[in-house]
Amino acid sequence: MRRTALSLVLAPAAVALALAAPARADVPETVAKVILPGYAGFARATRDLATTAATDCTPEALRAPWNAAFDAWLGVQHVHIGPAEEGGRALAIAFWPDPKNIGGRQTEAMLQGADPALVTPEGAAQLSVAARGLFGLERLLYGDASDTNPAYACALRRALTADLAAMAQAIEAGWKDGFADTVLSAGSPGNTTYLSAAEARQALFTQLIAGLEFNADTRIGRPLGSFDHP
């Protein structure tokens, strides 16, 4: 899996730059230039991944589009408000960290049990969040768990990629078809989500700060350790 510290930090930084604009332009600019194109790119990348899996579900064929989908997710993974929160989608897309290896154990159990009901998009959507999404696929693309049951692993990759694409498209549609307007119309009569423009701006800042803290404390901080316990 190829991830860099720079790519993890740049996405929240893009939101910071947008929110540093004049007060009347910051929220619209963030929505128009960061969030909407970011989720559109993620939906497109996951759709490409699912399309590839439908014709060739081998790890070798799927690693490049999986990496592209992961890169696209990093651009929006810190924006959890609205459609990404619904149904726990963000957690199902990227359940990490998983210190107890819940996802790994569940994946092994699925490969051993080979339940045909699970290798459909509908079946995959009912799985635990620990076994779904980008990290569920990573185990089937880079680990040796698939050796237990290669044919079932292939079908499971197809189901998980289709499930991932469905979640990405639902989030994109949720922003385009309503939630973007909810954010942009903050303070307007009838907007019960954000009672003022300041509330919407604060919500985006909160997402930004949470994303930066997660990168610093978990993605970077955990591998580095502390001065006393490196």
Task: Please give the residue ranges for each predicted region.
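Positively charged n-region of N-terminal signal peptides that target proteins for export
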Residues: 1-4
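Sec/Tat signal peptide C-region and signal peptidase I cleavage site
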Residues: 19-25
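Bacterial N-terminal signal peptides
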Residues: 7-18
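Mature extracytoplasmic or organellar-lumen-exposed domains after removal of signal/transit peptides
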Residues: 26-230
